[in-house]
Amino acid sequence: MFGKVEEKLNNVLKTEGALYFILIDPDEKNCLEIAEKVKDYADAIILGGSIGITNLDETTKQIKEIIGDIPIILFPGNVDGLTPYADAVFFMSFMNSNNTYWTTTAPTLGAITVKKYNLEPISMAYLGIEPIKRTAVGFVGEVNEIPQRKPEIAGMYCLSAKYFGMRWAYLEAGSGAELPVSNEIIGISKKLSGINIIVGGGIRTPETAYQKVLSGADAIVTGTLIEDNPDAVKEMRNAIKKAGIDKL
């Protein structure tokens, strides 16, 4: 049984072949400005960060007023990254963290708040891919990063996630990563698991996004892109949607 947000995302996948998620850090001073710029291009807004969260309730309400019916999915960096004003939450395990806090304890502590806030949980495996160790999420999450040259390891993690009952896997190279997740990792992860594959980190050009979708990605995440080139979001969406149709 899917919730409303996940059902909506799956319906877009069936008709358009790929999703475009835009990550907004609620602690960024210009987060409302970013929301205004991207509202016409995102299939969902992913809201969260890997360091501190301040004034999340008010920021989420303000972003919701700007983006209208576009779902806000929380991407919590810790148990304080939850708010009742979002539509859903990626209920995730950082599967290749060396610290059990991130694999099981944090989601366990957050579960009762997810229920209290009536947030739709979207079960997801979160996997740190090389070079994530050199990014904030890799440092905070104490990640045992998956080497780019060993795509079968990522594939096995995704298959494990499927057997645990997770429906999504996020292959993350880290915000601002110098290299994105390889096409080989994406391809084998999708082929082995069959679950929805999200790819983020280091995707800076429409051409790169196009190749990631053709390789098997179901959703592409960009975040810092809008800060570097505000006009790139439309081009990115067009490339993702073209690849999605070409893949169908």
From Swiss-Prot:
Pfam families: PcrB. The keyword Ribosomal protein does not apply. It comes from the Archaea. Mg(2+) binds at D25, S50. The keyword rRNA-binding does not apply. GO terms for cellular component: cytoplasm. SUPFAM superfamilies: FMN-linked oxidoreductases (SSF51395). Its EC number is 2.5.1.41. InterPro entries: GGGP/HepGP_synthase_sf, GGGP_HepGP_synthase, GGGP_synth, IGPS_HisA/HisF. It catalyses: sn-glycerol 1-phosphate + (2E,6E,10E)-geranylgeranyl diphosphate = sn-3-O-(geranylgeranyl)glycerol 1-phosphate + diphosphate. Transmembrane segments: none annotated. Sn-glycerol 1-phosphate binds at Y170, L171, E172, A173, G174, S175, G176, G201, G202, G223, T224. Its main location: cytoplasm. Its cofactor is Mg(2+). Pathway: Membrane lipid metabolism; glycerophospholipid metabolism. Belongs to the GGGP/HepGP synthase family. Group II subfamily. This is Geranylgeranylglyceryl phosphate synthase.
